[in-house]
């Protein structure tokens, strides 16, 4: 991995710096680095492709070295360099594509394709430049079974769920009480509802509880908690729990109420939040949201008509809130909405018509991976996302 990353980083730097008019001394370091890379690769033959629709190709390295000049780089120098850049870029993309369509149920983080396995041999160890990136550090740590640290913005932590829990419902669903929940990506939306607006609840306060669990613990969490739940706040026709009929979820947002969010790690209470806004939590792998809906002591006639004593009830009083994970660190590799690596992997596997593997579902769906995130999947995903980041450097 280190070698492939070094080649890609060198090619990327060469592409950016070698332009007409540039003073040679400004690019001398990357030129010398490229020449050292070429000397090491020349005389070797690599093979890529052969899986799905990927064509088989042989890469015979016989590249000329880049020259030196005392002057600014002219068009001839840039054009000759461009040929080397194009060859190396095509080689890197082919190796990455070949690696992306391979997976292994054991040692999935190690190279799987013949070309990358060959590059990992001792004869190429001198190609080891610019390996200070966090991706390489994490891969090296994970391959040694140490504890890497991954930093994410808007991490895709929550499985997609869009459902409800009923605590009370008459046969006609004219009087219902329960909790709707919607989770996806980095967001958890909750809507506690009651047609009677806690009319018969003790102390005019109705309690609702939602328990959630993450597939992997997260730490150093920055999150936003706000009123409202935009994805579940509209009138919606929902199936009943037995799927025999349908009923109308018709929410009216209620501000009277309180909430508590408890964060746990390995069953131990870590933190508790009772306020809206930006909050931080040290670490957690599960959470409990408790909502107390409070019936107002006084209501206007219009509000009383919406929630008449004894019914009929055409609306549900609804206390809603949204929890969004903004930043977090983990010891597990995840899909990140601010990164394109996961989509690069998915697109290459689809475009290559990759046969079904032993680790991931066909189509590489993140939701399915997250719902049953195994060690084998995590190991393979570590490798695949690193390879995708390498490919992105030369795209």
Swiss-Prot record:
CC annotations in GO: viral envelope; viral intermediate capsid
A UniProt-annotated Pfam family: Rota_Capsid_VP6
Keyword DNA-binding attached: no
Coiled coil: none
Keyword ATP-binding: no
An example Gene Ontology biological process: fusion of virus membrane with host plasma membrane
Keywords, alphabetical: Capsid protein, Intermediate capsid protein, Virion
InterPro entries: Capsid_hemagglutn (IPR008980), Rotavirus_A/C_VP6 (IPR001385), Virus_capsid_a-hlx_vir (IPR008935)
GO terms assigned for molecular function: host cell surface receptor binding; structural molecule activity
Localization in the cell: Virion
Domain of life: Viruses
HAMAP family listed in its UniProt record: Rota_VP6 (MF_04126)
Quaternary state and interactors: Homotrimer. Interacts with the inner capsid protein VP2. Interacts with the outer capsid glycoprotein VP7.
Its biological purpose: Intermediate capsid protein that self assembles to form an icosahedral capsid with a T=13 symmetry, which consists of 230 trimers of VP6, with channels at each of its five-fold vertices. This capsid constitutes the middle concentric layer of the viral mature particle. The innermost VP2 capsid and the intermediate VP6 capsid remain intact following cell entry to protect the dsRNA from degradation and to prevent unfavorable antiviral responses in the host cell during all the replication cycle of the virus.
Name the record gives this protein: Intermediate capsid protein VP6
Origin species: Rotavirus C (isolate RVC/Human/United Kingdom/Bristol/1989) (RV-C)
Organism lineage: Viruses, Riboviria, Orthornavirae, Duplornaviricota, Resentoviricetes
């Amino acid at each position: 991995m280190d070698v492939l990353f070094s080649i890609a980083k060198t090619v990327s730097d060469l592409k950016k710096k070698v332009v007409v008019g540039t003073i040679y001394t400004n690019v001398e370091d990357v030129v010398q680095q490229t020449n050292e890379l070429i000397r090491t690769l020349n005389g070797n033959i690599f093979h890529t492709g052969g899986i799905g629709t990927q064509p088989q190709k042989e890469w015979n390295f016989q590249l000329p070295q880049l020259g030196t000049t005392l002057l600014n780089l002219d068009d001839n120098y840039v054009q000759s360099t461009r040929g080397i850049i194009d060859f190396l870029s095509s080689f890197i993309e082919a190796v990455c594509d070949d690696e992306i369509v391979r997976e292994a149920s054991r040692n999935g983080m190690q190279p799987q394709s013949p070309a990358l396995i060959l590059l990992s041999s001792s004869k190429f160890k001198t190609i080891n430049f610019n390996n200070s990136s966090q991706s390489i550090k994490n891969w090296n740590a994970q391959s040694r079974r140490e504890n890497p640290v991954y930093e994410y913005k808007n991490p895709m932590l929550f499985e997609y769920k869009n459902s409800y829990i009923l605590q009370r419902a008459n046969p006609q669903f004219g009087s219902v009480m329960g909790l709707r929940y919607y989770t996806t990506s980095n967001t958890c939306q909750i809507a506690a509802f009651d047609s009677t607006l806690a009319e018969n609840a003790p102390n005019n306060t109705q309690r609702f509880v939602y328990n959630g669990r993450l597939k992997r613990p997260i730490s150093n969490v920055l999150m936003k908690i706000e009123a409202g739940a935009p994805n579940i706040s509209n009138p919606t026709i929902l199936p009943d729990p037995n799927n025999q009929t349908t009923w109308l979820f018709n929410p009216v947002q209620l501000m009277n109420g309180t909430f508590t969010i408890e964060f746990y790690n390995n069953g131990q209470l870590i933190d508790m939040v009772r306020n809206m806004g930006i909050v931080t939590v040290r670490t957690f792998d599960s959470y409990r949201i408790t909502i107390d809906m409070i019936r107002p002591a006084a209501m206007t006639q219009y509000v009383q008509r919406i929630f008449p004593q004894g019914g009929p009830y055409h609306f549900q009083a609804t206390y809603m809130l949204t929890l969004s994970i903004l930043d977090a660190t983990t010891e597990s590799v995840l899909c990140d909405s601010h990164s394109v690596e996961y989509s690069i992997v998915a697109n290459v596997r689809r475009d290559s018509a990759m046969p079904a593997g032993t680790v991931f579902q066909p189509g590489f769906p993140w939701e399915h991976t997250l719902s049953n995130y195994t060690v084998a999947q995590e190991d393979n995903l570590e490798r695949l996302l690193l390879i995708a980041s390498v490919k992105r450097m030369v795209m």
